[in-house]
């Protein structure tokens, strides 16, 4: 029997923590930005991902890939973006690349350092954009860690102008 494999084209595969505790907030009508501004959302997962070791992330994500495969998914895009600093973004991408080598599911990495503005750059968003453009994106490219570059263009996160700069840097 031959069956097609499914593709999950938008996952943040490698991350620490879970956010099911935010479900009640969503059910109560809170917006994504309200949850994030209250310390949840991306910032919560960023904290948990920064705290997790390479091995913890690898083992957890390997099990997730087993679940994907059981449901017919044979290819996933693995976005980073829960580090928002070089060390953790690198850790996420290296975990994804090791999984690509060791798991039956095809893992295609996307650098998404521009998932949110880290708390330490609040009020100085342009400095973070500059860090992404001048430092992080070139390092990812030089090391061959990702096939793609992405940005979260949303009110309160990255503006269209900032997003264009980030995406252009990824093409360079």
What are these regions (language model features)?
Residues 1-60:
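Metal-associated gating/positioning segment near the N- to mid-region
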Residues 41-60, 66, 74-172:
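Metal-coordinating catalytic core of metallo-dependent amide/deamination hydrolases
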